[in-house]
C-alpha cells in the first residue's frame, strides 16, 4: 500500500513553514510523496477575504515546483462551497484505494479536531499526523501520529500583515512566491 501525506490549507500565501512541515513528515514517516491540498472555502474561515483560487494555486505551484516528492491535489478546488475534509477524503480514498493517507495538521487544528465535520467517520479514512505549532499543544483524545519538527514561527496571516505594513518577508517564503506577490500587488491593503 502506498503512503501519501496530505497537507491542506488556504496557502494564502504558501511559505517555508508549509514546506518544512511537508518535508519533515515526508522523511519521518517514509512517505512516497506529499500532496498539497488547497481549500476552496475552509469552513473555519468562511467570511474572511481570501485571495483568488488562481493566485493561490499559482503561488503554490511556484513554492513546490523544486521538490519532486511534492505535488498539488486539486480535489477541493473542483467543488463549490465549504471544503470539508471528510468529503474530500471520502472521494480520494475511493479514487485511490491502494493509498494510505496521512493527513498533516498543525497544533491549532489538533485542538480543533472535536469540531471537525464528521470526525468519527474521517478517522476511518485517514491517519492524522500532528506537528507542533507555537502556542498550541498536540494533546487530544483522538488518535494522531506526532512528528517533531524544528520550530519555525511563520504563518500566512503574519505574512499578509507584513506585506500590508510593507515589511520584508525575505527568508520567510520562496523567492518566486515573493516575486509573484509583488508583481500582482497582493496583500497591499
Curated annotation (Swiss-Prot):
It comes from the Bacteria. It catalyses: nicotinate beta-D-ribonucleotide + ATP + H(+) = deamido-NAD(+) + diphosphate. Pathway: Cofactor biosynthesis; NAD(+) biosynthesis; deamido-NAD(+) from nicotinate D-ribonucleotide: step 1/1. Keywords: ATP-binding, NAD, Nucleotide-binding, Nucleotidyltransferase, Pyridine nucleotide biosynthesis, Transferase. Its EC number is 2.7.7.18. InterPro entries: Cyt_trans-like, NadD/NMNAT, Rossmann-like_a/b/a_fold. One of its GO terms (biological process) is NAD biosynthetic process. It is an enzyme of class 2 (transferase). GO terms for molecular function: ATP binding; nicotinate-nucleotide adenylyltransferase activity. Catalyzes the reversible adenylation of nicotinate mononucleotide (NaMN) to nicotinic acid adenine dinucleotide (NaAD). HAMAP family: NaMN_adenylyltr (MF_00244). Belongs to the NadD family. This is Probable nicotinate-nucleotide adenylyltransferase.
Amino acid at each position: 500500500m502506498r503512503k501519501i501525506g496530505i497537507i491542506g490549507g488556504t496557502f494564502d500565501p504558501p511559505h517555508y513553514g508549509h514546506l518544512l512541515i511537508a518535508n519533515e513528515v515526508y522523511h519521518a514517516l517514509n512517505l512516497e510523496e506529499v500532496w498539497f491540498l488547497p481549500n476552496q472555502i475552509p469552513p473555519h474561515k468562511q467570511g474572511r477575504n481570501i485571495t483568488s483560487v488562481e493566485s493561490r494555486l499559482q503561488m503554490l505551484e511556484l513554492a513546490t515546483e523544486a521538490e519532486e516528492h511534492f505535488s498539488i491535489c486539486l480535489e477541493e478546488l473542483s467543488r463549490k462551497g465549504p471544503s470539508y475534509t471528510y468529503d474530500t477524503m471520502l472521494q480520494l480514498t475511493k479514487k485511490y484505494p491502494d493509498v494510505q493517507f496521512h493527513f498533516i495538521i498543525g497544533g491549532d487544528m489538533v485542538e480543533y479536531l472535536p469540531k471537525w465535520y464528521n470526525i468519527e467517520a474521517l478517522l476511518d479514512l485517514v491517519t492524522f499526523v500532528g506537528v507542533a505549532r507555537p502556542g498550541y499543544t498536540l494533546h487530544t483524545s483522538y488518535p494522531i501520529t506526532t512528528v517533531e519538527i524544528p520550530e519555525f514561527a511563520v504563518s500566512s496571516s503574519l505574512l499578509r500583515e507584513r506585506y500590508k505594513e510593507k515589511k520584508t518577508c525575505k527568508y520567510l517564503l520562496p523567492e518566486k512566491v515573493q516575486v509573484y506577490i509583488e508583481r500582482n500587488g497582493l496583500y497591499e491593503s
